Amino acid sequence: LVIDLTGMDIANASLLDEATAAAEAVGLAQRVTKNNSKKIFVSETCNPQTINLIKTRIEPFGLELIVGNQKDFLKSEKSELICGVIAYPDTLGDIADPSEAISQIRKKGGKAIVICDLLSLAKLKTPAELGADIAVGNAQRFGVPMGYGGPHAAFFATKEEFKRSMPGRIIGVSVDRFGKKAYRLSLQTREQHIRRDKATSNICTAQALLAIVSAAYAIYHGPKGILNIANRTSKLAKLFADKIKIAGYELHSDNFFDTVTVKTKDKTDEIYRKAIAEKVNLRKINNQIISVAFDEAKRLDHVNLLLKIFGVKEVINKSTDVKLENIPQELLRSSKYLTHPVFNKYHSETEMMRYLKKLEDSDIALNRSMIALGSCTMKLNATAEMIPISWKEFSLPHPFVPINQMKGYQILFNDLIKDLKEITGFDAVSLQPNSGAQGEYAGLMTIRAFHKNNNESNRDVCLIPNSAHGTNPASAQMSGMKVVVVNCDENGNIDLEDLKNKSKKYSKDLAALMVTYPSTHGVFEEKIIEICNIIHTNGGQVYMDGANLNALVGIAKPGKFGPDVCHINLHKTFCIPHGGGGPGMGPIACAKHLEEFLPTHHHLQNSKLTKGVGSVSAAPWGSASILVISWMYIKMMGSKGLKLASQISILNANYISKKLSEKYKVLYTGKNGNVAHECIIDIRPIKEKTGITEEDIAKRLIDYGYHAPTMSWPVSGTIMIEPTESENLEEINKFCNALLNIKDEIDKIDSGSFEKKDNPMINAPHTYLELSSDEWKHSYSRQEAAFPKKYLKDHKYWAPVARVDNVYGDRNLVCSCPSMDEYKDEAA
């Protein structure tokens, strides 16, 4: 979808919002641009939220942000640039040919970043055709409600040559061991979980679920439907513009797609008041100009209401044929898009339903079995919690409507903030960060602003344990901090002596310690209070990664045992669905002395946060509509229920730890022999003895109907298991028995009962095509391959593909839909 509409070579699997996508594009440009420039140009006609977020992002690196008129600046500027960011169409709806600006940016050695509207690209020439290096934007209008700010998927597309510098997840095509096409995460060595502070971004959670919705929207409508929607939207804008001009108004531009900006002059305030009285929100640019945007959901009666508001008496009785001369002829698109059969096949609700069901059947999701991903907290997302997100009161509002119209939302925000403060023991909360990694970044930027306010800008060293999430060092780097790694001891705790030595060594420059509690090793850090005291004694602040908060809620409050700020993964502890990689929300909670430095936003004109770090998300409250899920969870559970959930999550993890310790080595426990809410199983002794790896075990679990646990993190050669409180004893026993049975299979390899080069472990997962083939080439039986436990005969999950060739996928990177010819070859 994104590759076709932008014309670029490669696209990632989504980003958080348009503003952060633009900031990530600036980051890519900085990585790949060969000159020594410190200058970044952003056109003043970009959206204000985008300009402000880019300003926040580049500030720690001493780069110069120039916001101005793109024509004048690019013509007069003689020095080199890192990049130039331009909008197409721009924030006022104007469509100007950006090719000259793109050419000027590239002549100055910079990369040309074009922020574009995905629907308009059904009508307009692609950014690629105009010479852009990077295209970004928001896919919200492809089937996703506004949601008072989100969630919706941003997109990021660029040239093939920049693929190894791209931010975010990339889904690529590979093959399984039979040569069948398979999808996988590609080029992961760019990402934070591997490259840490050298990663291309700190992205972990993005907006995968919303990207799927937008892709499904395009599949359902197809190229003809998308073009019809684009034409209808533009037609309404043109009808309005024509009548306005006849009535004597002057337009800001006659070239537009869906946004008409009118020079209202001395009538501005009167028109704006009339609009509010009619429950219509218009964008008042200043005292002279009002901007009107049409979307795909508007109708002719909306146009007539607008004409009435603008004092135009004539009514349009029917949608007459209108020539869409509002798009310059030279910018009209001629290239084809969405030509793949998947976009041209499923255009009835029946067929679309069956196609989506077919895709669902390929997944191991929580509606099928327990997902034991360590450090992910894959708990139940209860239906009652999620119903309100479908209500129009939550789903329809625009993020920049007047705040006095959103009293219900404000009550919800304040209520949630109050609850999160009570749960964490902190004094203030910002709901703006729209992922856990963004929460980390926001928290560290808040600490940075605190030090700067104390005239200690030199404090830029961030101590991070070697067990930390990869997002920690990546976020520290984004905040302009230098990462210094602290060792852990043999029990999984922070090495206190190493921490003392490094805190003392860097005491003059120490900004922060990032610590996860309970630790990523699955144990409660026994000396957490002393650890915090060491940092404070040496002038630093303590950032607590709240990834494992599910083991603390109702039991202990981070704000009371030492940390100064933490983020809260609402998509983990507080029940927002993970969505296969988003949406998420990562609010931050902090102590009183950091409150005034929390993120601000240009929409909040009366904010008390005068020293705030600027915006970290496009919308003031991030992905606001999904906050209702966490609100519902907290209210339904109550304080006793929240505490019980934490207790059961710890109990379940310890039950699994004890049960699996019969045949596996549990790597870390506390001094009492217990774990926190997750446990790490050491596979290294097994590999040393039999050659079987953690990946083999993860693949074999698929044959048993289970999603893989977290592999090789935080310790290489291990698997990490987190059951959450949502699983009952029957399901936990079933999962444990699957792993114990797998250990028996491994023992059979060791004893010679299974061949080392042909056994159920190294050939897993087994597909129904292999099981149903006329010829069975293995030394073990079909029964041993596919039905190692009796329950599988009643309800069996079949992997859609066999073992995937990871090396092939990275060496032969393909990130667009494979042609249908290849599928035909497979079936032949």
Model-derived regions: residue spans:
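Non-catalytic terminal extensions of PLP-dependent enzymes
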Residues: 4-5, 178, 193-204, 211-429, ...
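Short acidic-aromatic active-site loops that bind/stabilize oxyanions
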Residues: 1, 15, 87, 91, ...
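Proline/glycine-anchored alpha-helix kink/cap motifs
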Residues: 26-34, 209-219, 626, 630-634
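Conserved PLP-enzyme active-site core in the AAT-like
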Residues: 20-32, 36-182, 244, 261-262, ...
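Conserved phosphate/anionic-ligand binding catalytic regions in large, soluble enzymes, centered on
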Residues: 144-157, 161-162, 206-210, 298, ...
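Short loop-beta-helix segment that forms the pyridoxal 5′-phosphate
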Residues: 4-23, 420-445
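General small-molecule cofactor/ligand-binding pocket signal
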Residues: 11, 64-68, 252, 283, ...
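Short glycine-centered, acidic/aromatic-flanked micro-motifs in structured strand/loop junctions
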Residues: 12, 42-44, 86-88, 294-296, ...
